[in-house]
Amino acid sequence: MIRTMLQGKLHRVKVTHADLHYEGSCAIDQDFLDAAGILENEAIDIWNVTNGKRFSTYAIAAERGSRIISVNGAAAHCASVGDIVIIASFVNMPDEEARTWRPNVAYFEGDNEMKRTAKAIPVQVA
């Protein structure tokens, strides 16, 4: 059996740009991509914490150290500058591998300041 697992996640990054007329994609600081193990041109899901919208696009690399999160093209209808979003990528793998798999997670605060990275997501009770 093949399972689809969380590969990498940027947790609570802030949208810095939204360009409706750009070709598409989401430009992400290369340091952030590296931290989450997301590759340029990889499919990503974006979950907008601010407005509840969920959408898919692909990642492109923004300048390393820029802290840019730029939602482009039609996806710009789903996010505005200042919105808090979660960006995730997924990977398919055999069941045996999936049982021990740990995703790459980067946590952010403020103006896209990376606070820490982890290989697990802690259980939280609401």
Curated annotation (Swiss-Prot):
It is found in: Cytoplasm. Substrate binds at T57, G73, A74, A75. It holds the Pfam family Asp_decarbox. Binds 1 pyruvoyl group covalently per subunit. Pathway: Cofactor biosynthesis; (R)-pantothenate biosynthesis; beta-alanine from L-aspartate: step 1/1. Its cofactor is pyruvate. One of its GO terms (biological process) is pantothenate biosynthetic process. It is an enzyme of class 4 (lyase). Its EC number is 4.1.1.11. Coiled coil: none annotated. Is synthesized initially as an inactive proenzyme, which is activated by self-cleavage at a specific serine bond to produce a beta-subunit with a hydroxyl group at its C-terminus and an alpha-subunit with a pyruvoyl group at its N-terminus. It comes from the Bacteria. InterPro entries: Asp_de-COase-like_dom_sf, Asp_decarbox. This is Aspartate 1-decarboxylase. It comes from Escherichia coli O6:K15:H31 (strain 536 / UPEC).
